[in-house]
């Protein structure tokens, strides 16, 4: 009997040592955070179902929300300690993501307003394309920055621009290929197809980079409120990969198909980490 009592006492001590007791206020705070999280995740999954493009930021944001929810659940179950500062950080992140999901700002620059063949400098972008980018930057300010500032009047905010460039399968002119190779920090394959693919990947990246920098410049000229910074754009060069079009692309898909010469742009605003 004495041995049994000692056994139960040890079990109680071990259980207590592995549990983190919560106050009523802490439990209420966790419940409220979970409600916001569940709503934000449902809204993010809904926009993914409408815009299932794998290059968009929504899947990453949904994964981030699920990771936060998993951690909050562990805290609520007493498996990890409650941290007020961490909960405050999570709340800011979740509300920021939710605002972006509710007010998406994105564009696709098609071939009609895009760069000419082999071109990538912003000075070579059409005036219609530049006007579209200025309108895109204005939408970020009006639809995202101002709304997040209303939620967090004193917090620093960060604007994140994400650009994804594409190219077709057409070989480049010799003069452009030589000019492009001068700036590369890697050797160019001698085999024609591999060479073309590498140069088109570099071309698509430079187009995305030019567009991202132009949008950043426009945003910085438009933003007048304090504590708002524009991060360095996140640029991707997809080369000859087929852009997601929302529907299956059936062959023949011509090498010079105009649907391949595009750039996708996404804007998001978040509470800046401290």
What spans do the regions from the language model cover?
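N-terminal targeting segments with Sec-dependent signals, encompassing both cleavable signal peptides
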Residues: 1-274
């Amino acid at each position: 009997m004495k041995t049994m009592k000692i056994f139960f006492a040890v079990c109680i001590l071990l259980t207590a040592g592995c549990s983190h007791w919560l106050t009523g206020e802490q439990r209420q705070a966790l419940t409220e955070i979970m409600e916001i999280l569940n709503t934000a995740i449902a809204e993010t999954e809904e926009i993914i179902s409408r815009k299932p493009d794998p290059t968009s930021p929504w899947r990453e944001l949904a994964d981030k929300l699920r990771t936060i929810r998993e951690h909050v659940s562990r805290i609520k179950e007493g498996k990890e300690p409650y941290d007020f500062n961490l909960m405050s950080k999570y709340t800011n992140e979740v509300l920021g993501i939710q605002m972006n999901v509710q007010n998406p700002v994105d564009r696709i620059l098609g071939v009609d307003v895009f760069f000419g063949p082999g071109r990538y400098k912003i000075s070579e972008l059409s005036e219609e394309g530049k006007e579209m980018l200025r309108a895109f930057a204005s939408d970020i300010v009006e639809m995202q920055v101002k709304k997040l500032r209303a939620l967090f009047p004193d917090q620093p905010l960060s604007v994140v621009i994400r650009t994804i460039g594409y190219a077709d399968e057409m070989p480049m002119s010799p003069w452009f290929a030589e000019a492009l190779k001068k700036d590369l920090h890697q050797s160019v394959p001698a085999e024609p197809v591999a060479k073309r693919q590498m140069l088109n990947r570099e071309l698509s990246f430079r187009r995305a980079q030019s567009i991202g920098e132009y949008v950043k410049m426009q945003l910085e000229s438009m933003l007048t409120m304090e504590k708002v910074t524009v991060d360095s754009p996140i640029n991707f060069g997809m080369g000859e990969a087929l852009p997601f079009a929302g529907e299956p692309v059936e062959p023949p898909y011509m090498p010079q198909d105009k649907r391949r010469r595009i750039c996708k742009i996404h804007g998001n605003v978040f509470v800046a980490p401290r």
